[in-house]
Amino acid sequence: MAHAVRSKSNWCWQTYLLERINQVFSISLPPRAQPIGPVLAGAAFQTHSQQNNSGHQFGDRFHSKGHQDTEGRILWKEASTRTTDSTETADTQLVQRQGNGGICLS
């Protein structure tokens, strides 16, 4: 019986979190559009996780030998720069679009 209560409690907690995420990321979209609050929250969590990873864990994806050009040069710097730039751009756009308790995509 305790397991059933725990499962219901966990389900309620997940439902509450999803509703809260949708409230925090209230976005003006056409009625047929899908809610993107969970997607934004996932992106925010992923960005935060990447910042907290140690350098070698995050960098291994770009520093591996599989990311070389035809002359054998490692392309990690270019890939790393692109990742940082796109993250900064996304964060900047997110801050610029926030207003009136939500985000307005125009």
Swiss-Prot record:
User: For bias kind Basic and acidic residues, which ranges apply?
Assistant: 58-80
Q: In which tissues is it expressed?
A: Heart.
Region Disordered, annotated ranges = 48-106
- Show the ranges annotated as biased composition (Low complexity): 81-92
Q: What does this protein do?
A: May be involved with the regulation of GNRH gene expression. It is not known if this protein is transcribed.
Name of the featured protein: Putative protein SH
Annotated source species: Rattus norvegicus
